[in-house]
Each structure stands twice: as C-alpha cells, then as structure tokens.
Curated annotation (Swiss-Prot):
Belongs to the HrcA family. The keyword Iron-sulfur does not apply. It comes from the Bacteria. Pfam families: HrcA, HTH_DeoR. InterPro entries: DeoR_HTH, GAF-like_dom_sf, HrcA, HrcA_C, WH-like_DNA-bd_sf, WH_DNA-bd_sf, WHTH_transcript_rep_HrcA_IDD. Negative regulator of class I heat shock genes (grpE-dnaK-dnaJ and groELS operons). Prevents heat-shock induction of these operons. GO terms for molecular function: DNA binding; DNA-binding transcription factor activity. One of its GO terms (biological process) is negative regulation of DNA-templated transcription. This is Heat-inducible transcription repressor HrcA. Keywords: Repressor, Stress response, Transcription, Transcription regulation.
Length: 337
C-alpha cells in the first residue's frame, strides 16, 4: 500500500468513526468515500494499518477504530488549521466584546469555546509575572474597616476588607490612596513587595499603622493575582460522551477538579507550527487522561497562558483546533498587549 493511500484510508476511518461512533468496515469505506479501489483492497489496506498499530478491532467487531497512534498520524497530517466561517467569527466577536472585567471575559470565553466544540473548555488566567499595577482604591467602610482594591493592567481585580488598626477619616484615607497610587502605579506586581516599605516610611507617624496594614493587604492581593488559576465550562459534555470512556469517566473528572493536573499539562504543552498543541490519549502524562485528548494554544503577551479543550480521543480534531485557535486570537485582542 502506498503512503498516500494509507493516509487516505486512515483519514476515512477516523472521520467515519468520529461522526458515527461505530467501528468502520471496508464496505462502509467504499460506499462513503471515493477511494478508487475495491472492498477487498480496502480490507488488505486495513489489515496493514492494523499491523502498524494505527487501527484496532474493538472486541469481536468486524469494523475497526483508530488507536492513539492512528489519531496522532491523522492530526500530524493536518497541514494547516482551517479558518472558521464568517458566521462563527462574528459570533465569537459579539460574545466576547463588551466587557472590561477579566473574570467575565474568561467566563464568556470558556462557555463560548465549550459550545463551539461540545467539549470541556479550560483557560488559564493570564500569567502576571510582568503585569503592572494600574489602579489602587481604598474605600472606607467603617472608621477602622477599609476595602482595598488592586487592579492590574491585565484586567485582574483583587480586593480584600481589612482592619487598619486605627480610626481613619475619609480625607486621611484619600490622602493615603493618593500616596500609594502615585508611587506604585506602573510597578510590576512581582516587585510590589520591594516597593512598599518606601511608601510606608514616607507616611506621617500618626498614620503609619494604617499605612502598614494597607501595604500588607496590597502585598497579599498581589500574590493572589499571581497564583496560577483556571476557569472551565462544559463538564456536562463529558457525561454525554460517557460511551467514549469505557474504563471510567471518574479519573477525567478528577483531573479537571484537581486543577493542578490540568494547569501542569497546559503549561507543558508546546505549540507546533500550526499554532496549536494536541495531546492524545496515553501521550498525556496523567494516567487518568489516557482516554482523553487535549487541544490547546497560548493567548495574550508571549502566548504564555493557555486556552484549550478536553474531550475523548474520538474528537473532530480539525474543527476543534480551528475553534481553539480562533477563540484564543480574539481573547488576545480583547485583553490587549
């Protein structure tokens, strides 16, 4: 069997199995695809593909299904990620625009990607090692109670209510906010802790206790902003794909619940020349994802943070890759540089 025909037969098997969920036989391939050869020749071709470990027979079925190795060869032969339709692009644009709140943008993003792919969608919060302080706000709730708000240029908003240890008037708190913001605006979050002592020491002794409490709160908020987190949507799609996880869907749900597993996997996935990364079945380092595939890409500055989907290995890879990459590009555009 020639290499082009091998790839053509494999492609036909993958496409039929993805859409039908049924093992694929030689007769069905001849009827549905213009392969230009007889059913007997296709049977021989399928036997050769099985010998190479690219397809396998589930139980005693007469048909064949792709293996992880077969899916990998199929995915690697996708020369370029196809663009989405104009209607799909308009839908993405209209759903993602119109919000400046990072949490809202990411929540919309995963819900949209889940709807486009019928898979579980996940997105890492932006990596904030280079994020800068855009705004600081202190709101007096009671004479000693203050709401501290820290906003980064990435869109992250962190807030915390603290006891400043002394009574403060509105004008005194406003003066402290002006001093903190005037000194710290534009400071990288990663360097905030080193910059705070100078601000505190510049405050009059009578307000230094409050200034120290405010500085401590800002340091905690900056640390919270830099923690690796993710948001996801579409776990119900896994339940509808229960047949695709013959061993158990439990380990897949556990991997999603244990965010550290997904975050580590996303961080380790390297994009290829098409701008996406695909990890199939047992290629995943976590055993619980042996029956799942992950398609991801980077977004934002330097494409460090990842967005992607998780689903069964029986997946429409071309359309999924296109949706992931398109949504990532719109997300990058909305969040800006």
């Amino acid at each position: 069997m020639s290499e082009p025909r091998k790839l053509e037969v494999l492609r036909a098997i993958v496409e039929d199995y993805v859409h039908s969920r049924e093992p694929v036989g030689s007769k069905a391939l001849v009827e549905r695809h213009h392969l230009g050869v007889s059913s007997a020749t296709i049977r021989n071709d399928m036997a050769a593909l099985e010998d190479e470990g690219l397809i396998t027979a589930p139980h005693t079925s007469a048909g064949r299904i792709p293996t992880d190795k077969g899916y990998r060869l199929f995915v690697d032969q996708i020369s370029a990620v196809k663009p989405l339709s104009q209607a799909e692009r308009r839908a993405i644009q209209s759903l993602l625009e119109g919000s400046d709140d990072l949490d809202d943008v990411l929540d919309r993003t995963v819900r949209l990607l889940s709807q486009l792919t019928n898979q579980v969608a996940v997105v890492q919060y932006p990596h904030l090692s280079r994020a800068l302080i855009r705004h600081i706000e202190f709101v007096l709730l009671a004479p000693r109670k203050v709401l501290v708000v820290l906003i980064a240029n990435s869109g992250n908003v962190e807030q915390r209510v603290i006891d400043v240890g002394q009574d403060l008037a509105d004008d005194a708190l406003s003066a402290l906010r002006t001093r903190f913001l005037g000194t710290l605006a534009g400071t990288p979050l990663a360097r905030l802790a080193q910059a705070l002592p100078a601000v505190v020491s510049s405050v009059s002794p009578g307000e230094r206790q409050a200034a120290q409490a405010l500085a401590h709160a800002l340091e905690i908020l900056a640390h919270s902003s830099r923690e690796d987190r993710m948001v996801m949507a579409g776990t119900a799609n896994l339940a509808r794909s229960n047949v695709d996880f013959p061993l158990s869907i439990g380990p897949v749900l556990e991997a999603l619940e244990e965010q550290v597993v997904m975050l580590r996997l996303l961080s380790d996935m390297a994009q290829d020349h098409r701008g996406v990364a695909v990890s199939i079945g047992r290629e995943n380092p976590y055993d619980g994802l042996a029956e799942a595939s992950v398609v991801a890409t980077g977004y934002g500055p330097d494409s460090v943070a990842k967005i992607g989907i998780l689903g069964p290995t029986r997946m429409d890879y071309p359309n999924t890759m296109a949706a992931v990459r398109a949504v990532a590009r719109y997300l990058s555009r909305i969040l800006g540089p």
